[in-house]
């Protein structure tokens, strides 16, 4: 069995620092409007060209196990920031590297790392408070477009996301998909949609589009499998008398029940489309209830004592229009009461707040969107697959940044929010010299994002930082034009949530690295000499 290799004190910290630097140097060249790209090798297919911090960080694995630990810790800064805020991963890596670099200098000079850590935490809390206090709420479409434009570094993408948000609202779902063409466009799906299509192709009304359209239909919603026609007959007779079409949403429709529906459709007696209920298990029950509330119907389920053969026409839902495709059903203009829908939306929002599972949160968010607004799909097009992947990543980042901005407001971009937060550290009381050192480390680190943006634009970072520090509040450096401007007026803004999260995560991991004294890793196994057993072949000469 391979043993373990252990390194201590200064050697341990230096190895971690090398790993931190390796990852941060690769990521930070992408920061700002003049940031460069990174090319990632792929085992299959063409290399990937990206400008996204977390995607680059995820690809980095170092051969030295101790240095790799440092790189993996910074990777955690990037992924955690991405999970919470959806953007700001490069900034988080830059901040983490700065805190580690300054901190290790002081630890090597004899400072107590535990007390430095206390100073770092105190300063970060104060800086985060300053960032939150300076945040401005955003409402207008143009402000949303500015946030998205800065994140994606592309005005067209910014406007596209602002359009999508305007159409589906803050609670709406916006998904990003790869397009077949070369243009990027926005598609809005109005009403509630779910990924189940017609059970039988005989039910279609438009042979060219291969879809069924029902105008002003009744909607039967049940969690039961329908196979006996007797269960449906009493209800079918009432629907036929009304002269309206019928949409059946059930666990399944099969056997003679399906044959009866298809036969009536083909004879022209009445129009009916059957689809399977969306989702599985408890989620299916919840989604059927959502559809019932949206359409003003009742879920016919034996759990509450309702039987299909006793169902009345009053228990059916209504909608202005229903479109059923091969794999999708869209209900437009449900006749449900606005009060009931509002209550249901509030209930789902509460569940989103309480759930800890990311998967559940995502599914609840989808249900919320279908009830509250609709779904917007951004179709990403490009001339090559490599460009498309890069564009898709940028759009996803911009979308996350925009959601974060709507949630917690915006602050001046271009690293200016961190420079402004420096003033909040001025009167901070340090209990000891080492604690003051911790505060000063954060003070220096807060300048680093602006310094890096200027450096990527080919300028001397320290000069730009000093000019911004001495300028009026809100004035920053526009790296694209090389001018000093009011950042919010110029539309250079960052979401407060992204700015805050990047600093908190960077400080958390960096402080852990500073207080590390020992590293333990697997000892690499020496490769066995596979040719060693061939030595005995020298005796083959006597075989003649």
From Swiss-Prot:
Enzyme Commission number(s): 5.6.1.7
Predominant cellular place of this UniProt entry's protein: cytoplasm
Record GO terms (molecular function): ATP binding; ATP-dependent protein folding chaperone; isomerase activity; unfolded protein binding
GO cellular component: cytoplasm
Binding site for ATP: 30-33, 87-91, 414, 478-480, 494
Catalytic activity: ATP + H2O + a folded polypeptide = ADP + phosphate + an unfolded polypeptide
Subunit note: Forms a cylinder of 14 subunits composed of two heptameric rings stacked back-to-back. Interacts with the co-chaperonin GroES.
Function (record text): Together with its co-chaperonin GroES, plays an essential role in assisting protein folding. The GroEL-GroES system forms a nano-cage that allows encapsulation of the non-native substrate proteins and provides a physical environment optimized to promote and accelerate protein folding.
Sequence similarity: Belongs to the chaperonin (HSP60) family.
GO biological processes: protein refolding
Alphabetically ordered keywords of this record: ATP-binding, Chaperone, Cytoplasm, Isomerase, Nucleotide-binding
Origin species: Pelotomaculum thermopropionicum (strain DSM 13744 / JCM 10971 / SI)
Cellular compartments annotated: Cytoplasm
InterPro entries: Chaperonin_Cpn60_CS, Cpn60/GroEL, Cpn60/GroEL/TCP-1, GroEL-like_apical_dom_sf, GROEL-like_equatorial_sf, TCP-1-like_intermed_sf
Protein name per Swiss-Prot or TrEMBL: Chaperonin GroEL
Name of a matching Pfam family: Cpn60_TCP1
HAMAP family according to UniProt: CH60 (MF_00600)
Gene3D superfamilies xref list: GroEL, GroEL-like equatorial domain, TCP-1-like chaperonin intermediate domain
UniProt lineage: Bacteria, Bacillati, Bacillota, Clostridia, Eubacteriales
């Amino acid at each position: 069995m391979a043993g373990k290799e252990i390194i201590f004190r200064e050697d341990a910290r230096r190895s971690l620092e090398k790993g931190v630097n390796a990852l941060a140097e690769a990521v930070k060249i992408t920061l700002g409007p003049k940031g460069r790209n990174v090319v990632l090798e792929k085992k299959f297919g063409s290399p990937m060209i990206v400008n996204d911090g977390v995607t680059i960080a995820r690809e980095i694995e170092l051969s030295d196990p101790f240095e790799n630990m440092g790189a993996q810790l910074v990777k955690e800064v990037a992924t955690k920031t991405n999970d919470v805020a959806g953007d700001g991963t490069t900034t988080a890596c830059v901040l983490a590297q700065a805190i580690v670099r300054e901190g290790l200098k002081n630890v090597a000079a004899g400072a107590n790392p535990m007390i430095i850590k206390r100073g770092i935490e105190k300063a970060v809390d104060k800086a985060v408070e300053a960032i939150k206090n300076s945040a401005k709420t955003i409402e207008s479409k143009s402000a949303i477009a500015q946030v998205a434009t800065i994140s994606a570094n592309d005005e067209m993408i910014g406007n596209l996301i602002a359009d999508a948000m305007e159409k589906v609202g803050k609670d709406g779902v916006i998904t990003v998909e790869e397009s077949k063409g070369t243009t990027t466009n926005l598609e809005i799906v109005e009403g509630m949609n779910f990924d189940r299509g017609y059970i039988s192709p005989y039910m279609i009304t438009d042979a060219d589009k291969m879809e069924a359209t029902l105008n002003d239909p009744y909607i039967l919603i049940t969690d039961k499998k329908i196979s006996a026609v007797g269960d449906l007959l009493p209800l079918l007779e009432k629907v036929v008398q009304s002269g309206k079409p019928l949409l059946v949403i059930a666990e399944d429709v099969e056997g003679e029940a399906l044959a009866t529906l298809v036969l009536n459709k083909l004879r022209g007696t009445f129009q009916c489309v059957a689809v399977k209920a969306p989702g599985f298990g408890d989620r299916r029950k919840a989604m059927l209830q959502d559809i019932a509330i949206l359409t003003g119907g009742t879920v016919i389920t034996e759990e509450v004592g309702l039987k299909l053969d006793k169902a009345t026409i009053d228990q059916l839902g209504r909608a202005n229009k229903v479109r059923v495709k091969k794999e999708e059903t869209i209900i437009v203009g449900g006749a449900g009461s606005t009060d009931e829908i509002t209550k249901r939306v509030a209930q789902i929002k509460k569940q989103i707040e309480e759930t800890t599972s990311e998967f559940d949160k995502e599914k609840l968010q989808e249900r919320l969107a279908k009830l509250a607004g609709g779904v917007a799909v951004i179709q990403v097009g490009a001339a090559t697959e490599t460009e498309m992947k890069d564009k898709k990543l940028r759009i996803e980042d911009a979308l996350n940044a925009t959601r974060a901005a709507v949630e917690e407001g915006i602050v001046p971009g271009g690293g200016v929010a961190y420079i402004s937060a420096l003033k909040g550290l001025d009167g901070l009381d340090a209990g000891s010299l080492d604690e003051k050192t911790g505060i000063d480390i954060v003070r220096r680190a807060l300048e680093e994002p602006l310094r890096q943006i200027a450096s990527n634009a080919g300028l001397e970072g320290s000069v730009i930082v000093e000019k911004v520090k001495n300028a009026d509040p809100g004035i920053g450096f526009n790296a694209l034009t090389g001018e000093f401007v009011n950042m919010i007026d110029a539309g250079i803004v960052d979401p407060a949530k992204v700015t805050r999260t990047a600093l908190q995560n960077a400080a958390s991991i960096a402080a852990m690295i500073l207080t590390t004294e020992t590293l333990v890793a697997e000892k690499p196994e020496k490769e066995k000499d596979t040719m060693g057993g061939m030595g005995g072949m020298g005796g083959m000469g006597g075989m003649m």
